[in-house]
Amino acid sequence: MKLKTLVKVLAVGLVLVGTHVPSTPREATPPPPQPHINLDVCGAPSLPVARVKARALITQIRADLAAVEEEIRHVPFLSAVEAGTVPVAQIAAVAAEEYSIIRSDMQSFTSMAQRWDTPNGSHFFSDLAAGEALALPLLLTFGAHVGLDEQALAAYEPRPKAQTYPSRVAGIAANADRASAAASFLVNFGVFGENMARLRAALSGVYGFAPEAIAFFTFFAEPIPGFEEDALEVIAVGLLEGACPRDVRRSARLLQAYELDFWQAAADPPGSPLPVIGPPMP
């Protein structure tokens, strides 16, 4: 009995000692190595690498175009509208230009959707086309508040410099790859939305338009939920298909330059006379 008891005591002691002996520290598992991303090489070997490359490419493009974005933000037209010194007819000319732009972009986005969207996959471009379709009646509402019906908007003669943007979008629809298309709009929509938000604020606070009258500007001022992630995925798929970063950068640079064209043209005289009326002042 004593021997058995002693054996039990020794066994328990060994167990207790074992539980208090510090174990040899394990080396932390290093994170998997990040793939080397060369932004001068076309394509990507896999979708995960393409996703990393898409983000890196957009970061690079945004840095490259930062100066142009600042020009877009600081065009004299916006400051003048905020100061209340721009005639309503000239502001209405922006809407008249947008009438041509929206109708053109709607067709271009529809063409892109036919090229790149899939029934059970991406609907990125069809969503953009649907957005233009929603914006058009809002634009007509603004036109009605300044005395312009759709016939008057259609009769307006656009300024060439204000229409370089939709011409480029049509070119993207016909000739670009999906990565170049998605990157161009991802980089562009942010600053366009900022300027539309400033117009909305000035039209409300300075010119006295009611919220329902300027819903068109509100529509484009608000960011699209999930837009960046959706665009990055389309860019990644395009890179996986062999798209070249050089082409993606070029497309984004051109579209942003044409965005600047639009806002600079807004300060020029309207392309043709517009029979506008002023807003009801508070």
Show where each model-derived region lies.
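Bacterial N-terminal signal peptides
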Residues: 9-18
